[in-house]
């Protein structure tokens, strides 16, 4: 397989922000709708842009709810974000082997930078496409197409890695190969229904898929 470019989603793929996201949603929703939302209820909100989620809940309060969410999220970011096993070493190895690495996320750039700095992944990526950079978020192909242009990469030589069906669909729409991650909070079986080309049990599985020997 001739893959020289790897694009990653951020949340739930490279860094474990599940607790942070869930607590941010629960804090926000309980503020406006006390005791109406549970942890299970907000799992469906993980992945899409905040604006899409809050518009479906309360179109009149979208900006206010986003502000409440982000204030809590930023205040608790470093305490609640965790690392996934083998991610750092795998990304470092791919970087050292000369793969072109990018991130495609539906987060705003400020929060993306917080996560990358905290996990010390920030030096490995030549291109980071955030919600601030696009008109259409995943599953639209625009974010991936922008990353490909940024990295001067071809879709047929690129692998998109993500924990959400939006990542898999965006990759398919843009013509890349796709890999799901089995540690997705929505469940391996759910992600498998979108038929990614590969399913990673841990991030280091990428190395064997790509024929790369670790350091």
UniProtKB/Swiss-Prot annotation:
It catalyses: diphosphate + H2O = 2 phosphate + H(+). It holds the Pfam family HAD_2. The keyword tRNA processing does not apply. The active site is at 9 (nucleophile). One of its GO terms (molecular function) is phosphoglycolate phosphatase activity. One of its GO terms (biological process) is DNA repair. Keywords: Hydrolase, Magnesium. Hydrolyzes pyrophosphate formed during P-Ser-HPr dephosphorylation by HPrK/P. Might play a role in controlling the intracellular pyrophosphate pool. This is Pyrophosphatase PpaX. It comes from Anoxybacillus flavithermus (strain DSM 21510 / WK1). The lineage of its organism: Bacteria, Bacillati, Bacillota, Bacilli, Bacillales.
């Amino acid at each position: 397989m001739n893959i020289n470019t790897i694009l990653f989603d951020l949340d739930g793929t490279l860094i474990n922000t599940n607790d942070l996201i869930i607590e941010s949603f629960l804090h926000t929703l309980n503020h406006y709708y006390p005791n109406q939302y549970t942890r299970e209820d907000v799992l469906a909100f993980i992945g899409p842009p905040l604006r899409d989620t809050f518009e479906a809940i309360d179109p009149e309060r979208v900006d206010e709810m986003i502000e409440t969410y982000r204030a809590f999220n930023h205040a608790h970011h470093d305490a609640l974000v965790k690392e996934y096993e083998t991610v750092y070493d795998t990304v470092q190895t791919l970087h050292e082997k000369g793969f072109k690495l990018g991130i495609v996320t539906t987060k705003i750039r400020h929060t993306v930078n917080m996560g990358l700095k905290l996990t010390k992944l920030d030096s490995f990526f030549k291109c980071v496409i955030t919600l601030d950079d696009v008109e259409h978020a995943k599953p639209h192909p625009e974010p991936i197409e922008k990353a490909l242009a940024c990295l001067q990469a071809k879709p047929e030589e690129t692998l998109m890695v993500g924990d959400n069906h939006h990542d898999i669909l965006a990759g398919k729409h843009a013509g890349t190969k796709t890999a799901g991650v089995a540690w997705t909070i929505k469940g391996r079986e759910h992600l498998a229904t979108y038929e990614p080309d590969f399913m990673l049990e841990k991030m280091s599985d990428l190395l064997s898929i790509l024929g790369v020997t670790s350091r």
